[in-house]
Amino acid sequence: MQLDAGNLVDFYETAVGQAARRMISHRLRLLWPESRGLRVLGYGFAIPYLKPFLGEAERVVALMPAQMGVVAWPAGRPLTVLGEDAALPFAEAVFDRILVVHGLEGADAARLLLRQLWRVLAPEGRVLLVAPNRASLWAQMEASPFACGRPFHKGELDALLRDTLFEPLQWDRALYLPPFSGRRLARMGAGWERLGRRFLPGLAGVHLVEAGKSLYGLAKPQKLKRAESALARA
């Protein structure tokens, strides 16, 4: 499956796509139960997961990368914009929460994208990545939207976040439902999740990781500024 907006819209209209949305959304809300008064950005194809924030957050924006294309969402008052990974069209530190779904794995330069997300995230803000698990069936099957681009082991995600001045704070997994499930199996999604979390935790379809700005990343510009001042006085 190509990671473009049209294919993803079609996937989330299927029985297995709707089940996947429910399973992932459930874990997302456990990690982020409250967004009242916050400014929320969804990056990638995050719109299936942003609806709960519309009635709570101060502001919700869905940014879709140029190579993916864009769809109008929600109906009647579109909040979607198109942007480039290397230059997100926002000022610094404007979002309190950033949700990334179908975004990191397809990025041309994942580190550059994460540095841009760091730039637009508020100092006390949080980013939540939903990324395909390299060990899962969802990352192996061609018809799966989580098989596009680069899948990740947990350690790879951890290293990538730390390299881009994020500090991982919470980890979770979701999506034990097989990607080839028909309507009948898709209805049993909650049962698949319970069994998978208990007996096969490493085979979840996606990793979920919440991260904040690292103290090193926040302190570094100040240290550089002091060093430059000292050199200027010398």
Task: Give the label of every model feature segment.
Residues 1-34:
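Class I SAM-dependent methyltransferase Rossmann-like catalytic core
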Residues 147-171, 175, 207:
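Short alpha-helix
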